[in-house]
C-alpha cells in the first residue's frame, strides 16, 4: 500500500462505517510496516494516534489491521524515537 505523509485515507470498520485519517508516518519495526494515523474529523480524539499494521488478506491485497497493546507500545516508542531524532 503506497501512502505518503499528510495523505488522507478512508478506512472502513467492521460495521461498514467509514473513518478518515491523516497519515502521519509509515514506520518499519522489526521487519513489519506500520501506519501512524490520526482521525481527521473527530474533535474529541484529535490528539489520539492510531497505529495499524500492514498485512495481506487471503487474496494477496495489502490491508491495514489493528494491533495488540504490547505491539502498539513497541511501535509508538519507535515512532517517538524517530520523531525525536528528526527534530
Swiss-Prot record:
Pfam families: DUF1292
Name under which the protein is recorded: UPF0473 protein Daud_0916
Similarity annotation: Belongs to the UPF0473 family.
